[in-house]
A protein has these predicted regions:
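Surface-exposed, interaction-prone regions used to assemble/regulate multi-protein complexes
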Residues: 1-123
């Protein structure tokens, strides 16, 4: 079992701090090149039932039925690039289901994970 302890967003980095009860270890998940987040509701429960990470190439992003990704494509219809970030490089979607049955998603360019003092590993 794991519990969500903290969620923070600093411009283009979202960070989740998770406590893994099985290993008694803190897990830090950093979503870099952060694009956005949906449906976060941690009012009554922070226990994580399921988490999955999916890399989506640009061709999948533009065909996706995901409402957030559809809005993103509408916002950038002629160019999928701004600053140094390129949507053509794809989007990473981290989906987390809590025990209150609310699933929230983070959208970013890269996810790094560090556990128990380890350095972050990119995904």
């Amino acid at each position: 079992d794991s519990s969500l302890k903290q969620v923070s967003v600093r411009y283009d980095v979202a960070e989740l701090i998770i406590w893994n009860c099985n290993t008694n270890c803190k897990v830090i998940v950093q979503c870099k090149g952060f694009i956005g987040m949906t449906d976060l509701c941690i009012w009554d429960d922070q226990i994580i039932l399921q988490a999955e990470c999916r890399n989506m190439p640009w061709s999948d992003v533009i065909r996706s039925q995901d409402a957030f990704l559809q809005s993103l494509c509408k916002a950038y219809p002629y160019s999928s690039q701004w600053d140094e970030r390129r949507l053509e490089d794809g989007v990473v979607v981290l989906s987390v289901l809590l025990t209150n049955h609310i699933r929230f998603r983070l959208y970013c360019q890269r996810i790094d994970v560090a556990t128990c003092g380890e350095h972050a590993n990119s995904n």
